[in-house]
Amino acid sequence: YVWDRNYSETRLPEVPSAILEMLSHQSFPDMRIAQDPLGKFYIARSIYKTILRFVNSNHGTRYVVQPLAPQNFSVTQNGGVALLSWSAQLDKTEPSARPTSYIIYKAEGQGGFDNGTIVNTTRCQMQLEPGKLYHFKVAAVNAGGESFTTETLSVLYNPAASKSVLIVNNFHRLASPQVVDDEEKQGFDFDQDPGVSYGLTAGWSGKQQVFDRSRMGNETSFGLGFSGNEMIGKFVAGNDFNYVQAHATSIAASGKYNISSCSSEVIASGRVQMQNYQAVDLINGLERHDGYTHAFFKSFTPELQNRIRQYASQGGRILISGSYNGSDMQTEEEQAFLSDILKLSYEPTGSTVIARDINPEDSTVTERDSIVCTSPNVKGLGLQFSYYNELNAQHYAATHPEILKPVGNYAFTAMQYDTGTSAAVAYKSTTYRSFVMGFPLECIIDESTRTSVLLGILKFLTD
């Protein structure tokens, strides 16, 4: 441990240094900021700006602040030519952070990213080699440095393909563990929602065990905020912003489709039209409106709902996977979207339903209460498989998969948890088709199984 060590860097004058008292661990509002990945970023960027201004002002030189990551990223292809498009994200508090150029990083197939190509505009065309899968990400640049990169997007030109798939990334969420803050309880509830870190993170000693506000100030194992130590030294995978790449790799294995991809932002704005594609693969991941994160995240924003409605009315074929496709849609209008367009209803885990047991000898029926639940094991499409459902260092976990039930004619359960509850709902009519999963497809542990599942769903949607 280093928390109780004698920090010579802050005592000896050889190296200029300082301890910044930004937040108090005894202030819950402060800790909400400290646990929020976006809060950590804002604090770090503020410190960076302060040091930059201090050093440059001492030397009488002009400073330029590093830009923010580009947004509204899309990579679409037409006839073997890829069009990359994005927009600058401006820092409203710092005029000098405006980007002057961009770096496009490219990877081919299973290879790593190159050292990047500098461009001066927010659009770029590239010739694609037939049959080769490409992955791209973009960073903004100015005299102050280079930004974080965008999410990773993928593109594939297959001359023999008659159908094109658009992969849409809607998993942008970053969040602390579930905030509990009422008259009786206070803290972070890992079991309710472990949150979403930015990439791989080792940030916790253990789960909070005591939430009783009446025990505030008690410095014992019974005091408010007391936590375990089971997570000391353990890394937890978060949002890597590269799940389009995983989906594209599976789709490319079929050799049957062209692939384009984009962020959900450009779908909502209409810059990329879903109706130009024979199928859409929407990645929702752990996206949801949690009610405590400062930034707004949502599985289906009103704008995205409208685009999906339009796509369905024009004969669209859409796959949607994620952990909160049902629970994140609670208003009357949102539930109408689920039932009218996606042909499903959400059943909370732990709900009590009436089960009917039939006696095979005399056919008598006995009714009993049964509690519905999910499991990490799923069967469907002729396969049995497992997905990441516990925190680990390899891949983000779907700790709260959902039960999605079919609604109306032509909708049916396409996957089941081994508890017998519905894990996915498929809908096939003469107008449009949909396939909605109660857990993220990219969380399927075995890669070959994940590919088989995704290609099986695309076959259902497009054949």
Segments predicted by a language model, with ranges:
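Active-site-adjacent mobile loop/cap segments within catalytic or ligand-binding domains
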Residues: 1-59, 438-441
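Pro/Thr/Ser/Gly-rich low-complexity, intrinsically disordered linker/stalk tracts
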Residues: 53-96, 130, 145-162
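Short beta-strand elements bearing conserved aromatic residues within extracellular beta-rich modules
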Residues: 100-104
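Short beta-strand segments within Ig-like beta-sandwich modules, predominantly Fibronectin type-III
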Residues: 114-121
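Beta-strand-rich modules
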Residues: 125-146
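A glycine-rich, often tryptophan-bearing local segment used as a flexible ligand/cofactor-contacting loop or short
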Residues: 286-393, 453
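Catalytic beta-strand/loop cores that center a nucleophilic Ser/Cys/Thr
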Residues: 352-446
